[in-house]
Amino acid sequence: MARVKRGVTTRARHKKVIKLAKGYRGRSKNCYRVALQRVEKALQYAYRDRRNRKRFFRSLWIMRINAAVRQYGLLYSDFIYGLSLANITLNRKILADMAVHNKDNFKQIVDLTKEALTKSRVG
């Protein structure tokens, strides 16, 4: 059986890691063993933060909606409940965008939710 020399695959694997470590400081950019540790940790951070980004943006949208709704005398929780009563199915991302960029349309939605809330409390 022929002898298998592993230099080609090792070099390719090392090049791949060094390429991922481009832009790092010190030995992290050109020393394979250090670069491998740094790249693995960077990938862990990336995996974690892809999930954290979703949480962060949802909380940001909620803060923006809450701030915009309080200008019209409503609480965030009442506003969300009023949306469900009024059968308005806009998500928080769209509502937050409207609160920042389309204040007139957002005011109309707030008025609709106020009407739905008063109807539910009266009848």
UniProtKB/Swiss-Prot annotation:
Annotated Gene3D superfamilies: 6.10.160.10, Ribosomal protein L20
Lineage, opening ranks: Bacteria, Pseudomonadati, Pseudomonadota, Alphaproteobacteria, Rickettsiales
Top-level taxon of the source organism: Bacteria
Gene name as annotated: rplT
Bridged cysteine pairs (disulfide): none
Family from the record: Belongs to the bacterial ribosomal protein bL20 family.
Protein purpose: Binds directly to 23S ribosomal RNA and is necessary for the in vitro assembly process of the 50S ribosomal subunit. It is not involved in the protein synthesizing functions of that subunit.
One Pfam family of this chain: Ribosomal_L20
Name of the protein: Large ribosomal subunit protein bL20
